[in-house]
Structures are given as C-alpha cells and as structure tokens.
Amino acid sequence: MINETHPGFLPLVHVKTKEEMVKVIHNWLSSEEAVQEYCPNMRNPFCLRHRMDFRTDVGTLLNLGIQASSQLYCTPRKTSLEYGFYSDIQVDYPSWTFSHNVIKTYAENTELPCGTVYPYIPIEVVAEELLKAVRTL
C-alpha cells in the first residue's frame, strides 16, 4: 500500500525535464528522511535502499525501488548520504512495465519485468522512464 504521507512519496507531476528528474533521483538517494524511514542504522551498508512512490498526472499511484550503495549494482559503488551522484543505479520491482528496450537491455529477468532487478541502469534512463510514467499512466 502506498502511503502519501511517508518520506518515500514524491509529488513528481511538477517535474518537466529529464534533468529535473535526475536531480529528484539524486536528492531522493541522499534524503535523510527517507534513509531514517527505511534504514535507521546508518552503518548498514544497504542504507541507500528506498522505495519511491509517486502519483502520475492522472492520479495513478506507482512505485519502484531505487538503490545505491557499496553493496549494490551502482556506479560508483559507494554508500554515503553526502556522495549524492551516481551514474548508474539499481532499480527493482517497478509497479509498471518499463519500455521494451529498457527491459531487453537492463532487466535480469526479461520474462518478469515488474518482478526483477535492473542493475547498473543509467540514472538518465530511469529519469526518462519515470517521466513517461508520470505523463502517460
């Protein structure tokens, strides 16, 4: 169940460009509130694992996991709230189906696109998929 009051809920309908969405993702990965919500023990190597929940332009609720840390599929493999810039991140279990090319290129299990991990996916690709979802679903 998506909770619009928890720190993981993001109002993305105001985001208009891929560059703005990349900033939203980087800010989300370094969000202290979200980290405290999901990983109160900051020494945990998995502390930058979050569910990102959002509502689309037409009101559909969607979510996906966005992760980055020294133990996950991201570039660079670092864990730090202060680091803030990742070129590739780990995405998992989106509640909608990504575009065919993204699934074919990045999904670990192409037969189950909403039930798989997308390792080392460029943050710009994630931003494009989020923008498409916000505008069309």
What are these regions (language model features)?
Residues P7-F9, T17-E19, R43, V58-G59, ...:
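Intrinsic-disorder/low-complexity loop/linker signature
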Residues S70-P122:
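Intrinsically disordered, low-complexity regulatory segments enriched in Ser/Thr/Pro
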Residues M52-F54, L64, I89-Y93, V126, ...:
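Generic structural hydrophobic/aromatic packing signal, biased to beta-strands
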Residues G115-L137:
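Active-site or metal-binding loop neighborhoods of secreted/extracellular toxin and effector enzymes
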Residues F9-P11, E20, W28, L61, ...:
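Acidic/proline-rich low-complexity IDRs
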Residues H26-F85:
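Amphipathic, interaction-prone secondary-structure segments
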Residues I2-M42:
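Surface-exposed intrinsically disordered loops and tails
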